[in-house]
Structures are given as structure tokens and as C-alpha cells.
């Protein structure tokens, strides 16, 4: 095996609550496998919302908004696996994670698809409803970025109401453990492939940017 492998977790919760507890559980599983695990709390990152410019539909360079998003994106690019974890708020994805996937996606990731072939994991935390919907949205986001999703049985959805309740959801935590184990298996497999073959591409990434040549922002062309 090469240098220590790493999983980066993106925590889309506004507080140090159940989602953070779940990621601490995930960290223990990863570290038991010898994988470095780092959690980035979006609540601690200065993050601007997308503005009205619309330039992201046409420009070939990164977003010009100056905030903490590029630093997080750089950590994602350097990692071997990435977990997107978010609580359910208002029957949907918590606003911090929603803002992040918009800003990171259209501002930085769409041009060269630097997350291609990285291993992805999805965790959603909910009181009762919409855990599956949030899990599905984040899954589609990972697929959009050409990441590799590994099957681990039931989705890693954890149910909790009050602080600390997530740690009482034994089935949910079991699914989180299985997710991290399967991510680690795939990361190690890909690492071994690179080491034995000397290839860094692993899987063909095809065209760099599927949006090139699409006229998506016709309003800017109008006088």
C-alpha cells in the first residue's frame, strides 16, 4: 500500500450535533482500518451564496467569489474518498450543504471533474422524514462528479431527534460502519491497482467538461 489513504467527510450541519456524532463514529471505523479521516464542518467555513451573475454557465475558469470554498475543494481533490453528510431540514438538505454543493460544483468542480474516480459515501440524518430524499440528492451529486459509489447494503441513514439520539440508532450506525468499510475496501483496491500497473487514471474519464459547447446562458447574449 502507498502513503496513508484518506477519507474526507463534509459535514453540512449548522451545529455540532447528531451529524457530527455520526461522523465521529465513521472516523473510528476508518481509523481502525488504518485510514486517515478528517471531517470538515461547513459551519466553520466562510461561504458566500451564489450570486446573480450567471457566469458559471459560460466561463472556463473558477469562481471569483473570495471565501473558504476553494480550500475545502482542495482537500477533496487530495483525498481518496469523500463522505457527504447532511441532516434533513424542512424536508430537504440542510442549507449549508445545499450551498456548498452549488458553490463547489458550478464554481470549481465542473471544469476538469477532479473528483472523477474518487470513492464517495453518503450519510443523511433525520428525525423521521426525508432521509431518503436527502441521501438520493447527495448520491446524484456524487454521480454528477463521476465519483465511484460502492454498495453497502441499506443506505447510511440515521434517525435522531435530540442531541445524542443518533448514537442510539444501532441499525443506522451499523449501516454507516458498513459504508466506511466498503469505501475503504474500494479505496485500497484502487490504490493497489495504481501501484501494480503504474496507471493513475484507473478508469477513463472521457471528456473533461460535458458542458463545453452548450449554449446555456443565452440571456447574456441579449442586448
Swiss-Prot record:
Transmembrane segments: none annotated. One of its GO terms (biological process) is antibiotic biosynthetic process. It catalyses: (2S)-2-amino-4-deoxychorismate + FMN = 3-(1-carboxyvinyloxy)anthranilate + FMNH2. One of its GO terms (molecular function) is oxidoreductase activity, acting on the CH-CH group of donors. [4Fe-4S] cluster binds at residues 50, 53, 56, 63. SUPFAM superfamilies: Flavoproteins (SSF52218). Disulfide bonds: none annotated. It is an enzyme of class 1 (oxidoreductase). Keywords: 4Fe-4S, Antibiotic biosynthesis, Flavoprotein, FMN, Iron, Iron-sulfur, Metal-binding, Oxidoreductase. Its cofactor is [4Fe-4S] cluster. Pfam families: FMN_red. InterPro entries: Flavoprotein-like_sf, FMN_Rdtase-like_dom, ISF_SsuE-like. Its EC number is 1.3.8.16. The keyword Disulfide bond does not apply. Binds 1 [4Fe-4S] cluster. Belongs to the SsuE family. Converts 2-amino-4-deoxychorismate (ADIC) to 3-O-enolpyruvoylanthranilic acid (OPA). This is 2-amino-4-deoxychorismate dehydrogenase. It comes from Streptomyces globisporus.
Amino acid at each position: 500500500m502507498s502513503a496513508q489513504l484518506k477519507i474526507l467527510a463534509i459535514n453540512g450541519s449548522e451545529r455540532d450535533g447528531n451529524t457530527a456524532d455520526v461522523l465521529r463514529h465513521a472516523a473510528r471505523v476508518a481509523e481502525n482500518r488504518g485510514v486517515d479521516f478528517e471531517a470538515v464542518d461547513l459551519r466553520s467555513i466562510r461561504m458566500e451564496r451564489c450570486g446573480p451573475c450567471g457566469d458559471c454557465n459560460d466561463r472556463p475558469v473558477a469562481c471569483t467569489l473570495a471565501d473558504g470554498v476553494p480550500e475545502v475543494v482542495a482537500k477533496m481533490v487530495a483525498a481518496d474518498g469523500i463522505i457527504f453528510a447532511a441532516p434533513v431540514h424542512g424536508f430537504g438538505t440542510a442549507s449549508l450543504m445545499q450551498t456548498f454543493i452549488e458553490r463547489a460544483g458550478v464554481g470549481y468542480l465542473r471544469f476538469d471533474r477532479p473528483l472523477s474516480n474518487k470513492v464517495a459515501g453518503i450519510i443523511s440524518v433525520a428525525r423521521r422524514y426525508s432521509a431518503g430524499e436527502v441521501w438520493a440528492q447527495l448520491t446524484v451529486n456524487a454521480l454528477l462528479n463521476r465519483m465511484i459509489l460502492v454498495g453497502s447494503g441499506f443506505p447510511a441513514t440515521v434517525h435522531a431527534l435530540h442531541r445524542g439520539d443518533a448514537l442510539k440508532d444501532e441499525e443506522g450506525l451499523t449501516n454507516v460502519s458498513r459504508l466506511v468499510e466498503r469505501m475503504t475496501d474500494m479505496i485500497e483496491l484502487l490504490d493497489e491497482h495504481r501501484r501494480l500497473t503504474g496507471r493513475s487514471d484507473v478508469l477513463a474519464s472521457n471528456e473533461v467538461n460535458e458542458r463545453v459547447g452548450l449554449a446555456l446562458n443565452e440571456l447574456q447574449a441579449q442586448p
